[in-house]
């Protein structure tokens, strides 16, 4: 009798050990570094970047968790938690993600945290749920390894607003073509030595020419939007200020015949102080939706929590079908072998 009891116990123990993880719970578990998991994670990042209207494009840094749920009658749903890092490419920049550099820790990096539910059915992928938020590295941590590195400051900082207005005025003064308006302050930093302010901002072409503008408020954005991304530095000296600005204009679709073509984007060196232009417009159109600009706010970065509308965060109202990204991201090594534990996966760049 005792032998029979022992035999039954061993049989139950063997069945528990041989069952795959997640069996009986309605899901299967994959390793976070499994090629299948990484494939779906890259689809999630591609979806995120396509829905960004402000701030900077994201790149996959780490896969934290993954579960694959069966969906009746067909298909399965991937439940993912991933970490991303900010790149130096703006959300409106058409540069392929593989050519975008990851913003380094010395530049005051920003990390994103995202949850995705992605349906796979008949070989196609559809995002059912997407929710993200992002957080900059703490100033204290940045100063630990780089005491003189520039630190993120608020968009509504007096020096930031002044630097953006001065830089945009300098750009328009040197540009003999289209007059550009401010769309977004994307990033701002204080530099301790030499004392200066670094800013990155987005501009858009209007139906005015630079030499004819008397009232910027009457200048309207073109029907075929053309955006540009600018980086500027304003050095604060006792004897005055020095501003330098460089803008990259993004390619646009053919414009109407009566639109003024934009000239080449000049780089302004050490320009004399320029009278700031009129304040920014009350609202501008960014991508498919209107985004109120108003006055710069107290944020230091554009949080990913604003990337998705309430509809998109639950399910794609348009039934958008997603396809695998054609180009892998930079710095990716080959697929990792079996790991223990299954998750979290490897860190591709750095943790903050």
UniProtKB/Swiss-Prot annotation:
Entry-linked InterPro entries: Cystatin_dom, Cystatin_Fetuin_A, Cystatin_sf, Kininogen_Fetuin_HRG, Prot_inh_fetuin_CS
Region (Disordered): 256-280, 319-338
Sequence positions bearing Phosphothreonine: 135
Pfam families for this protein: Cystatin (PF00031)
Bridged cysteine pairs (disulfide): 32-343, 89-100, 114-132, 146-149, 208-219, 230-247
Record keywords: Disulfide bond, Glycoprotein, Phosphoprotein, Repeat, Secreted, Signal
SMART domains: CY
GO annotation, cellular component aspect: extracellular matrix; extracellular region; extracellular space; protein-containing complex
Glycosylated residue positions: 99, 156, 176
Gene Ontology biological process terms in this record: acute-phase response; animal organ regeneration; cellular response to insulin stimulus; cerebral cortex development; male gonad development; negative regulation of bone mineralization; negative regulation of cell growth; negative regulation of insulin receptor signaling pathway
Post-translational events: Undergoes complex post-translational modification involving N-glycosylation, and addition of fucose and sialic acid residues. Phosphorylation occurs at a serine residue.
Domain Cystatin fetuin-A-type: 19-133, 144-250
Subcellular location: Secreted
Modified residues (Phosphoserine): 134, 138, 309, 313, 316, 318
Site description Cleavage, residues in chain: 143-144
A single MF term (Gene Ontology): cysteine-type endopeptidase inhibitor activity
Tissue-level expression: Synthesized in liver and secreted by the hepatocytes in the blood.
Top-rank lineage group of the source organism: Eukaryota
Low complexity bias locations: 256-273, 328-338
Job of this protein: Could inhibit both insulin-receptor tyrosine kinase activity and insulin-stimulated receptor autophosphorylation and, concomitantly, antagonize the mitogenic effect of the hormone in cultured rat hepatoma cells.
Cited PANTHER family: ALPHA-2-HS-GLYCOPROTEIN (PTHR13814:SF6), FETUIN (PTHR13814)
Family: Belongs to the fetuin family.
Protein name as annotated: Alpha-2-HS-glycoprotein
Gene that this sequence comes from: Ahsg
